[in-house]
């Protein structure tokens, strides 16, 4: 019994000592390393000499583009890397620890900001995410953020427009003698989530230098090119406008009674014009108010409004032609009018079949009525063709611009490229 008790006591003692040594080796060394780094590091002082900062971003999602206020909102992952000698240590003195994590507020961080930002949301402020530090002094600061940046919107080809927005990163206080900003590669797209309205066309970056108060400042500019997906606007605006226009044209030039009652046709034309004017206001509220460029969609809608206006005015001309037969009982339509409207050929065949003169069969009122009916048919056909041509062209442009395929190819190529950096 005494031997068994002694064996158990020795076993428990050995395990306790081993656990204590393990805890001291890993947990104690980590705490000791943190105290060591914070004691010799001054968070208010940047590293000695010029600091080379590698600045890279990963585009995650284009939240939206506000055309009226001319800005773009994006979600990005930002990774900044630099070397700080005061945060280095010898691995053998801390039981082989090569990496550690320090609180963000406890070390020096470069003041890299977005110069053209309107709003900046740090998504990890409440989380207090730590910063990774390597034994060589290399610091890696990674965080997600939502930026709302200024973006000059071009509206001349709306809704077939492409936009190029910039995100400009630079140091606020330090010049190039102290901070040299570099980017090792284009923005990554490994985790990109497509936008419903905008198709991503290209992403690129460039490093530039500019002078500010007699100092040279380096900046990194990221270019994000997007193209609008126009199909929604064609379905919601172009198609209703076209249908209203065609129906109004058909109503304006439909066959009417011999009592020449056409006054309600003007009401139809005015109603159609007002309906399309309301639809054009929807587009006007969507795009910036600019006097330099008029959106293509606004030009189209104003064009069909003008066409309906002209058609409404021409209705009065047809009314006068129809009424002329009741006012002039012996004055027949001129031959050139009958030839233009193909009436002469019709009644020439009629003469050959029946052997009677045209004037002996038809009264003058019927002749002018036939002229007005032919004018209705001709004008309705001409206006519908004129209005249909730009409408078909808009749909042709829409189907020619396969933005979804271009975006898919871009993302596939970008993901293959991004594998080199992971």
UniProtKB/Swiss-Prot annotation:
- Tissue expression profile of the protein: Expressed in the posterior body muscles.
Keyword Nuclease present in the record's keywords: the answer is no
Q: How does it sit in the membrane?
A: Multi-pass membrane protein
Which residue spans belong to the Extracellular compartment?
21-233
Question: One GO CC term of this entry?
Answer: plasma membrane
SUPFAM superfamilies assigned: Neurotransmitter-gated ion-channel transmembrane pore, Nicotinic receptor ligand binding domain-like
* Gene Ontology terms for molecular function: excitatory extracellular ligand-gated monoatomic ion channel activity; extracellular ligand-gated monoatomic ion channel activity; transmembrane signaling receptor activity; transmitter-gated monoatomic ion channel activity involved in regulation of postsynaptic membrane potential
The set of disulfide-linked cysteines is 151-165
Task: Name where it mostly resides.
Answer: membrane
Signal sequence annotation: 1-20
Task: List the subcellular locations.
Answer: Membrane
Report the record's Gene Ontology biological process terms.
chemical synaptic transmission; monoatomic ion transmembrane transport; regulation of membrane potential
Show the stretches that span the lipid bilayer: 234-254, 268-288, 294-314, 379-399
Functional note: Forms a proton-gated ion channel with pbo-5 that is activated by acidification of the posterior coelomic space, leading to posterior body wall muscle contraction (pBoc) during the defecation cycle. Not necessary for stimulation of posterior body contraction (pBoc). Does not bind neurotransmitters such as acetylcholine, gamma-aminobutyric acid, glycine, serotonin, glutamate or choline.
* Description of how the protein assembles with itself and partners: The functional channel is a hetero-oligomer of pbo-5 and pbo-6.
Under PANTHER family, the record lists: NEUROTRANSMITTER GATED ION CHANNEL
Q: Which family does it belong to?
A: Belongs to the ligand-gated ion channel (TC 1.A.9) family. Acetylcholine receptor (TC 1.A.9.1) subfamily.
- The name this protein carries in UniProt is Proton-gated ion channel subunit pbo-6
Q: Which organism is it from?
A: Caenorhabditis elegans
């Amino acid at each position: 019994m005494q031997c068994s008790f002694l064996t158990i006591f020795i076993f428990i003692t050995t395990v306790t000592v081993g656990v204590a040594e393990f805890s001291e080796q890993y947990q104690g060394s980590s705490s000791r390393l943190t105290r060591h780094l914070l004691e010799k590091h001054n968070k208010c002082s940047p590293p000695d000499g010029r600091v080379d900062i590698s600045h890279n971003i990963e585009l995650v999602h284009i939240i939206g583009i506000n055309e009226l206020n001319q800005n773009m909102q994006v979600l990005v992952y930002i990774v900044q890397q630099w070397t700080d000698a005061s945060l280095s240590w010898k691995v053998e003195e801390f039981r082989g620890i090569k990496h550690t994590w320090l609180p963000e507020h406890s070390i020096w961080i470069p003041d890299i900001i977005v110069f053209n930002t309107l709003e900046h949301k740090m998504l990890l402020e409440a989380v207090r995410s730590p910063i990774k530090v390597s034994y060589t002094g290399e610091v890696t600061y990674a965080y997600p953020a939502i930026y709302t940046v200024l973006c000059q919107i071009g509206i001349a080809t709306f809704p077939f427009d492409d936009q190029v927005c910039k995100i400009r990163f630079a140091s606020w206080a330090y010049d190039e003698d102290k901070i040299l900003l570099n980017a090792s590669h284009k923005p990554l797209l490994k985790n990109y989530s497509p936008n419903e309205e905008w198709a991503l066309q290209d992403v690129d970056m460039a490093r530039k230098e500019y002078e500010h108060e007699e100092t040279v400042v380096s900046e990194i500019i990221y270019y994000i090119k997007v193209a609008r997906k126009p199909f929604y606007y064609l379905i919601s605006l172009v198609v209703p406008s076209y249908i209203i226009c065609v129906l109004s044209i058909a109503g304006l030039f439909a066959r009417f009674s011999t009592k020449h009652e056409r006054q309600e046709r003007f009401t139809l034309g005015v109603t159609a014009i007002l309906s399309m004017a309301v639809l054009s206001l929807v587009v006007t509220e969507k795009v910036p108010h600019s006097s330099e460029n008029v959106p293509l969609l606004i030009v189209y809608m104003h064009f069909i409004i003008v066409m309906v206006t002209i058609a409404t005015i021409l209705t009065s001309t047809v009314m006068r032609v129809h009424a002329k037969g009741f006012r002039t009982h012996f004055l027949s339509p001129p031959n050139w009018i009958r030839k233009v409207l193909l009436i002469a050929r019709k009644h020439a065949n009629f003469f050959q079949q029946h052997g009677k003169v045209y004037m002996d069969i038809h009264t003058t009122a019927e002749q002018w009525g036939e002229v007005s009916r032919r004018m209705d048919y001709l004008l309705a056909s001409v206006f519908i063709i004129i209005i249909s041509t730009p409408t078909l062209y808009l749909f042709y442009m829409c189907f020619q611009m396969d933005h979804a395929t271009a975006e898919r190819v871009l993302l596939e190529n970008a993901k293959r490229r991004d594998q080199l950096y992971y």
